[in-house]
A protein has these predicted regions:
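Pocket-lining segment of extracytoplasmic ligand-binding domains
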Residues: 163-232, 238
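Beta-alpha junction/loop-to-helix N-cap segments that form part of ligand/metal-binding clefts
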Residues: 60-118, 213-237
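Structural motif
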Residues: 55-77, 187-201
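Extracytoplasmic "Venus flytrap"
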Residues: 17-42, 48, 57-67, 213-218
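Short, small-residue-biased leader/transition segments that mark boundaries at the very start
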Residues: 1-2
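Flexible loop/turn connectors
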Residues: 241-290
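An alpha-beta-alpha
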Residues: 23, 41, 129-176, 274, ...
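Hydrophobic alpha-helical segments within soluble ligand-binding/sensing domains
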Residues: 16, 111-151, 252-273
């Protein structure tokens, strides 16, 4: 089933010469981080274009890759001016659907993995660019060590269907090992086996790390129940997962990330920048965040420099 809305917006329309820009937004799944990125993207373009000069066709694939393909093919048939792929599968579907329409990704961890480009250097040379939501993995590993200096076993929990999640697991593992931890990855295929895999991971680990992962983000309630029962704390790769089941995260602002993506779209549509030469951008700021109640429950001593956020 397709979940779809179309809307127009009014604001400052300087520089548009009255042109109406039609933008298709394919969002992989509904959850806090991706929702914020979509909102930031739309807000930026609304502010810059406005006055009925931009129309968004926003559709949510509800976590289904095949639906992403259907949505993006519809965008291509409509000959939209630009497509936003929010989430890895959404970007991949857009990339497969058209070599011509400019495509921007957001909430993407690693574009080389997403686009299957082994020689990725930050510029696609094609009709694809965008923003990455990856907070520096070495800093994430260092933060976990800061909070759990006496832990021995770190488990990494992620969805095997998400290529970017495996990339994060593979990339952060050496940093954990360098910090003196024994590391094991635990992957679940989809939402149906989250609970079983999470239980095994909790039983065999002193602390879990969950990277930015859309399926995990949509199942934090299940993961939290398992981890709480097992008394296994979780460090998360992004704020939404942390609020749902974690104790701490090194987080970016997904609204800020979406606005950065919107700025790139504006530069393509209005300023005529060549997307084939545009570098993938990252969020400008990262923040150490923690959930006080959960940290207190586990007896975690949180050093200075962390910002408190509330659990959901």
């Amino acid at each position: 089933m397709l979940f779809r809305s179309a809307e127009s917006s009014k604001a400052d329309n300087s520089g548009t010469d009255g042109k109406v820009y039609n933008i298709g937004i394919c969002q992989l799944v509904q959850h806090e981080a991706l929702d914020a990125a979509t909102k930031g993207f739309k807000d930026y373009l609304t502010e810059k274009l406005g006055a009925d000069n931009v129309k968004f066709d926003e559709q949510n694939a509800q976590g289904d890759s095949a639906t992403c393909a259907t949505i993006c093919n519809q965008f291509v048939s409509s000959n939209y001016d630009l497509i936003l792929g929010n989430g890895t599968a959404a970007l991949q579907a857009a990339y497969t659907a058209t070599p011509n329409i400019p495509i921007l990704g957001t909430s993407i961890t690693d574009y080389g993995t997403a686009l299957d480009k082994s020689d990725w250097n930050g510029v696609s040379g094609m009709n694809v660019s965008g923003t990455t939501d990856l907070a520096p993995l070495d800093q994430q590993a260092a933060m976990l060590k800061e909070l759990f200096p006496d832990a021995k076993n770190v488990g990494i929990l992620y969805c095997s269907a998400e290529a970017n999640s495996k990339y994060q697991s593979d990339t952060i593992t050496p940093y954990f090992k360098d910090a003196g931890y024994t590391v094991k990855s635990y992957s679940f295929a989809d939402s149906n086996d989250v609970a079983a895999v999470a239980k095994t991971a909790c039983d065999e680990s002193d602390v879990l790390y969950i990277p930015t992962d859309n399926t995990a983000a949509s199942n934090t309630g299940i993961i939290d129940n398992v981890a709480t029962a097992a008394k296994t704390p979780i460090v998360a790769g992004e704020e939404g997962i942390c609020k749902g089941c974690g104790v701490a995260t090194l987080s970016i602002s997904y609204d800020e990330l979406g606005r950065k993506t919107g700025e790139m779209a504006y530069n393509i549509l209005v300023k005529g920048e060549d997307i084939t030469k545009m570098k993938v951008e990252a969020a400008p700021n990262v923040t150490k965040e923690y959930i006080k109640d959960r940290c207190d429950t586990y007896g975690i001593k949180v050093p200075d420099g962390y910002t408190e956020i509330k659990a959901e």
